[in-house]
Amino acid sequence: MGLYQLLKPALFQLDAETAHGLGHRVLDGIQGTPLERIVADYCTVVDPRLRVDAFGQTFPNPVGVAAGFDKNAEIPDALGALGFGHVEVGGVTAEPQAGNPRPRMFRLAEDRALINRMGFNNDGADIVGERLAATDCRVPVGVNIGKSKSAANDDAEADYQYTYERVADGGDYFVVNVSSPNTPGLRELQSRDRLESILGTLQDDGASPLLVKLSPDLTDAAIEDAIEVVEDLGLDGIIATNTTTKRPASLHSDAADEEGGLSGAPITDESTDIVRFIAKRTDKPIVGVGGIDDAESAYEKIRNGASVVQLYTGLVYEGPTIARDINRGLLKLLERDGFASVEDAVGVDI
């Protein structure tokens, strides 16, 4: 049993957001110190078979940190040192936001899940942009861009554009987030016309590589519309998926009825199904997100069409060596199945 598993019972006595903040402070304390290099040497799996080239980026391995863990771009270097192949910061909004009242993050320990209703709490595009510009991360850094709560949907294009222009110099790729369930009216921007307008505005402003993050709660027809927008505009990829507002009957935890987006093990199969659905309809690279907490769940996303994957909830339950453990496991799975690289395994189950 590793150190994190020994500490986890004590950490889980804390409020979920408080525990997250504690972990964040530890990583912030490591970042930029000699200890960061020691951590990187311990956690990083270096093997050319893990390398993935997708949407103009070279990822040293396919396992990334999903948006939400480092909302303000404060610890991307430290997260990279944990062995992740990329880090996505944000969601970042044009204006600073306090987010929703606490408590707003809940563990569903029996279900290996989280529910959050954070509400895009962040320092705002001006401050986050300055941090990103000063960042020299060892892995690609993506920037997840959300809409300010104060901005009407009719003003969404200008709001997203303001944020993009402030973070443009510090991001390696950019993600339009229209799928968080915790900003009123945001998911309405997933309609074809609104999505096309927002993405087109950012493209015209030079945003590249540009991806869109979709909800798992969309209908098949709505997903197909989004794919058509991605194809028509020549976008670089799709992230599938965000959290869900659905509550599977299988949930057992007391917090299951809390309002917000559900992530973790209960959405594994649904998110994989959506990855496969998208991969059957487009050759655009897909970032698979949802319920990844070990090599097998990451491999399943990859075999169903994901070029790279991301996790957040898995980090809460498995601890800071999760990227190392997944990458080691992926190498064994590739050897077992006769693949020369991760890229060779992408989409083989479609």
Curated annotation (Swiss-Prot):
GO terms for cellular component: cytoplasm; plasma membrane. It holds the Pfam family DHO_dh. FMN binds at residues 67-71, 91, 144, 177, 213, 241, 264, 291, 312-313. It catalyses: (S)-dihydroorotate + a quinone = orotate + a quinol. The keyword Oxidoreductase applies. CDD domains: DHOD_2_like (cd04738). InterPro entries: Aldolase_TIM (IPR013785), DHO_dehydrogenase (IPR050074), Dihydroorotate_DH_1_2 (IPR012135), Dihydroorotate_DH_2 (IPR005719), Dihydroorotate_DH_cat (IPR005720), Dihydroorotate_DH_CS (IPR001295). It comes from the Archaea. Residues 249-268 are annotated as: Disordered. The keyword Heme does not apply. It is a peripheral membrane protein. Its cofactor is FMN. Its main location: membrane. Belongs to the dihydroorotate dehydrogenase family. Type 2 subfamily. This is Dihydroorotate dehydrogenase (quinone).
